[in-house]
Amino acid sequence: MKKYDAIIIGFGKGGKTLAADLGSRVWTVAVVERSKEMYGGTCINIGCIPTKTLVHLSKVAQYSHFTTFEQYADAFHKAIEEKRKITAALRQKNFENLDSKETVTVYTGVASFLSPTEVEVKTDRETIVLQ
């Protein structure tokens, strides 16, 4: 069993902000996120940022006055790749911001409450109990 001052489930805006703040106060903090693809939360990965990126790039394509389907298809593929690059970079930066803090540990796995003070985390490699 690993003991922490705080266990935060979810690596979204609230979780990462709280973890960084508590970590800077020298609290030992565990952050649990179900998937590496969701570090940073919904906004960064599947919400605000990717949506705004695709909307912007669709407007760029619209004003490019393409004349063939192939030109639009190429713009679409480039937009999807640009969205992927942006979300990957933001996800990595969010992970590094927490992982670089000595008192914060990030777990990638599924969290379940065992009791009011214990959380079980099932990762790809092991099952850990946090308290």
Model-derived features: positions:
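Glycine-rich flavin
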Residues: K2-Y4, R25-W27, E33-Q131
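N-terminal Rossmann-like FAD-binding beta1-loop-alpha1 element of flavoenzymes
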Residues: Y4-V31
